[in-house]
Amino acid sequence: MAAGSGREEAAAAAGYGRGPPWVFRGRALYQLHLVKAATARAFVPRELRLVEAFGYTLGGMFLARYDDSPAGKFDELVVIAGIVWNPPTSCAWAARVLVNSAEACRHGRKEVGLPSHVATFSQTEADALRNKPLVKSNSFLSLLGMRSTVSNQGNDREIEISETKGSCTRHLCNISVPLTGSHKHKWMGPAIRMSLPSFSGQIEDHPDLLKYSCQVECRVRPVRPAKIWRPRITEPQECPDGKISSKGSEVLAEPDAQKHTVMVLLSKPILALEFNSLEMHVDAPKIVIPHSKKKEVRYSST
């Protein structure tokens, strides 16, 4: 087992060594949320300005399954706190990145300056949710004239995501993603190309402010927003240090960051896009100089 694990890590390292750009292929759900500015600020460095309107910023999540990547097959959840402004550009800021690949986690932290953590992604399929979701979809898409094209299948794929550290596990959330049927019998949406710029860094592994870009090619179509919830009752768990704690305790590091991450996920979804035939090229990050400290960007109706 140890030898096999070593070979896998060496192969993954060799895969990342062929970049940048690093190429990821698979499928994803890109979901935008209205996140309270007060929640997003918990993740944004003080020298960066949060772009907000009426007390909210634009955050959300990027939930992906990669069939081909420098680290092989793995799942990823990027929780986006909001949009930050560092002249002359604005970019997304990740609150937390969860992956079920140790090498992908290492690369995210060491090379890209992301707040990456190892997690488990447990999946089941169900006709109906057994738990009442705390986030409900809305009619925002109808305002864009997209309502008739949004998938409304009855079945969902439930994903339970738990952060792991050694042999200790802490449940983060459950995500119910709509199943949209076989690709052979559905409209995949138009083929598009776009760039998703992001800021990163300001962590122990990368104290500098970084900027990188993801060049995305995929087929995109609007879908029903995923439903996200967290069970109200958790069972106690014994961690390696012998302490008994619930899965919501402070045994793992950054309890406040995890709490605010869940708050971002439970915020109001306004748009969900399904990315199929995804090919994403991630450029190497570059160091940028933070602009002088100013108050958050604010907009008003006057």
Swiss-Prot record:
Gene3D superfamilies hit by this protein: Acetoacetate decarboxylase-like
Signal peptide positions on this chain: none
PANTHER family given in the database record: PROTEIN NEOXANTHIN-DEFICIENT 1, PTHR35467
Record InterPro entries: ADC_dom_sf (IPR023375), NDX1-like (IPR039343)
Protein name: Protein NEOXANTHIN-DEFICIENT 1
Source taxon at top rank: Eukaryota
Organism: Oryza sativa subsp. japonica (Rice)
Underlying gene: NDX1
Role of this protein: Required for neoxanthin biosynthesis. Probably not involved directly in the enzymatic conversion of violaxanthin to neoxanthin. Is necessary but not sufficient for neoxanthin synthesis.
